[in-house]
Amino acid sequence: MARQIRKTHAKQKKNIINGITHIKSTFNNTLITITDLKGSTLSWSSAGASGFKGTKKGTPFAAQIAAEKAAKQAIEQGIRQTEVLVNGPGAGRETAIRALQATGINITLIKDITPIPHNGCRPPKKRRV
Protein backbone atom coordinates (compact mmCIF):
# COMPACT_ATOMS: atom_id res chain seq x y z
CA MET A 1 0.00 0.00 0.00
CA ALA A 2 1.30 3.45 -0.90
CA ARG A 3 2.31 5.74 1.93
CA GLN A 4 0.22 8.84 2.31
CA ILE A 5 1.93 12.18 2.08
CA ARG A 6 1.36 14.41 5.08
CA LYS A 7 0.11 17.87 4.30
CA THR A 8 1.70 20.57 6.41
CA HIS A 9 -0.34 23.63 7.17
CA ALA A 10 1.34 27.01 7.14
CA LYS A 11 1.07 28.87 10.43
CA GLN A 12 -1.64 31.47 10.14
CA LYS A 13 -0.78 34.99 11.17
CA LYS A 14 -2.79 35.93 14.23
CA ASN A 15 -3.18 39.65 14.69
CA ILE A 16 -2.63 39.72 18.42
CA ILE A 17 -1.09 43.00 19.54
CA ASN A 18 -0.67 42.41 23.30
CA GLY A 19 1.08 39.42 24.81
CA ILE A 20 2.87 38.04 27.83
CA THR A 21 6.52 36.98 27.75
CA HIS A 22 7.54 34.32 30.27
CA ILE A 23 11.28 34.14 30.95
CA LYS A 24 12.42 31.17 33.04
CA SER A 25 16.09 31.59 33.79
CA THR A 26 17.80 28.71 35.58
CA PHE A 27 21.51 28.23 36.21
CA ASN A 28 21.69 25.74 33.33
CA ASN A 29 19.33 27.15 30.68
CA THR A 30 16.98 30.02 29.78
CA LEU A 31 13.49 29.44 28.36
CA ILE A 32 11.47 32.22 26.71
CA THR A 33 7.78 31.70 25.90
CA ILE A 34 5.62 34.41 24.34
CA THR A 35 1.87 33.90 24.80
CA ASP A 36 -1.32 35.82 24.15
CA LEU A 37 -3.27 37.22 27.10
CA LYS A 38 -5.17 33.93 27.55
CA GLY A 39 -1.93 31.96 27.83
CA SER A 40 -1.86 30.24 24.42
CA THR A 41 1.71 29.95 23.16
CA LEU A 42 2.60 32.04 20.11
CA SER A 43 6.34 31.36 20.08
CA TRP A 44 9.01 29.90 22.30
CA SER A 45 12.73 29.41 22.35
CA SER A 46 15.47 28.32 24.69
CA ALA A 47 19.23 28.49 24.83
CA GLY A 48 19.41 24.77 24.06
CA ALA A 49 17.04 25.08 21.09
CA SER A 50 19.18 27.95 19.78
CA GLY A 51 22.16 25.63 19.36
CA PHE A 52 24.02 25.98 22.66
CA LYS A 53 25.13 22.85 24.49
CA GLY A 54 26.35 22.08 27.98
CA THR A 55 27.50 24.91 30.21
CA LYS A 56 27.13 27.50 27.42
CA LYS A 57 23.32 27.27 27.76
CA GLY A 58 23.48 29.09 31.09
CA THR A 59 25.30 32.16 29.72
CA PRO A 60 23.72 35.59 29.19
CA PHE A 61 24.66 35.51 25.49
CA ALA A 62 22.70 32.28 24.98
CA ALA A 63 19.68 33.90 26.67
CA GLN A 64 20.00 36.92 24.36
CA ILE A 65 20.01 34.75 21.21
CA ALA A 66 17.02 32.72 22.48
CA ALA A 67 15.04 35.90 23.28
CA GLU A 68 15.75 37.37 19.83
CA LYS A 69 14.63 34.13 18.17
CA ALA A 70 11.35 33.98 20.13
CA ALA A 71 10.68 37.70 19.56
CA LYS A 72 11.11 37.43 15.78
CA GLN A 73 8.57 34.61 15.66
CA ALA A 74 6.15 36.61 17.83
CA ILE A 75 6.49 39.73 15.66
CA GLU A 76 5.50 37.58 12.67
CA GLN A 77 2.37 36.64 14.64
CA GLY A 78 1.58 40.33 15.16
CA ILE A 79 2.85 41.04 18.70
CA ARG A 80 3.64 44.71 19.29
CA GLN A 81 3.72 45.06 23.09
CA THR A 82 4.20 42.62 25.92
CA GLU A 83 4.37 42.19 29.67
CA VAL A 84 7.44 40.34 30.92
CA LEU A 85 7.22 37.80 33.76
CA VAL A 86 10.69 36.74 34.95
CA ASN A 87 11.18 33.54 36.92
CA GLY A 88 14.36 32.04 38.35
CA PRO A 89 17.84 33.07 39.53
CA GLY A 90 19.84 32.52 36.32
CA ALA A 91 22.34 34.72 34.52
CA GLY A 92 20.19 35.40 31.45
CA ARG A 93 17.40 37.43 33.05
CA GLU A 94 18.41 41.00 32.18
CA THR A 95 19.98 40.19 28.83
CA ALA A 96 16.81 38.43 27.66
CA ILE A 97 14.74 41.53 28.54
CA ARG A 98 17.22 43.82 26.74
CA ALA A 99 17.14 41.57 23.67
CA LEU A 100 13.32 41.78 23.61
CA GLN A 101 13.49 45.58 23.71
CA ALA A 102 16.09 45.62 20.93
CA THR A 103 13.79 43.70 18.56
CA GLY A 104 11.22 46.50 18.75
CA ILE A 105 8.63 44.94 21.04
CA ASN A 106 7.29 47.51 23.51
CA ILE A 107 7.58 46.27 27.12
CA THR A 108 4.78 47.57 29.34
CA LEU A 109 5.55 45.71 32.59
CA ILE A 110 8.43 43.74 34.10
CA LYS A 111 7.43 41.50 37.00
CA ASP A 112 9.57 39.06 38.98
CA ILE A 113 7.53 35.97 39.89
CA THR A 114 10.37 33.89 41.34
CA PRO A 115 8.97 31.80 44.21
CA ILE A 116 10.72 32.66 47.47
CA PRO A 117 10.41 30.12 50.31
CA HIS A 118 9.54 31.15 53.85
CA ASN A 119 12.28 28.77 55.03
CA GLY A 120 10.96 25.71 53.20
CA CYS A 121 13.21 23.07 51.62
CA ARG A 122 16.92 23.00 52.34
CA PRO A 123 18.88 24.47 49.39
CA PRO A 124 21.64 22.51 47.61
CA LYS A 125 25.05 22.63 49.28
CA LYS A 126 27.61 25.13 48.01
CA ARG A 127 30.04 23.83 45.37
CA ARG A 128 33.69 23.37 46.29
CA VAL A 129 35.85 23.56 43.19
UniProtKB/Swiss-Prot annotation:
Subcellular localization, per the record?
Plastid, Chloroplast
PROSITE patterns with a match to the protein in the record? RIBOSOMAL_S11
Does Ribonucleoprotein appear among the keywords? yes
Q: List, alphabetically, the GO terms of the cellular component aspect.
A: chloroplast; ribonucleoprotein complex; ribosome
Q: Which InterPro entries match?
A: Ribosomal_uS11, Ribosomal_uS11_bac-type, Ribosomal_uS11_CS, Ribosomal_uS11_sf
Record bears the keyword Ribosomal protein: yes
Q: Which Gene3D superfamilies match?
A: Ribosomal protein S11 (3.30.420.80)
**GO MF, one annotated term:** structural constituent of ribosome
Q: Example GO biological process term?
A: translation
What does the UniProt keyword field contain? Chloroplast, Plastid, Ribonucleoprotein, Ribosomal protein, RNA-binding, rRNA-binding
* HAMAP family referenced in this protein's UniProt entry, alphabetically: Ribosomal_uS11
Q: Which family does it belong to?
A: Belongs to the universal ribosomal protein uS11 family.
Question: Quaternary state and partners of this protein?
Answer: Part of the 30S ribosomal subunit.
> This chain belongs to which protein, by name?
Small ribosomal subunit protein uS11c
User: Gene behind this chain?
Assistant: rps11
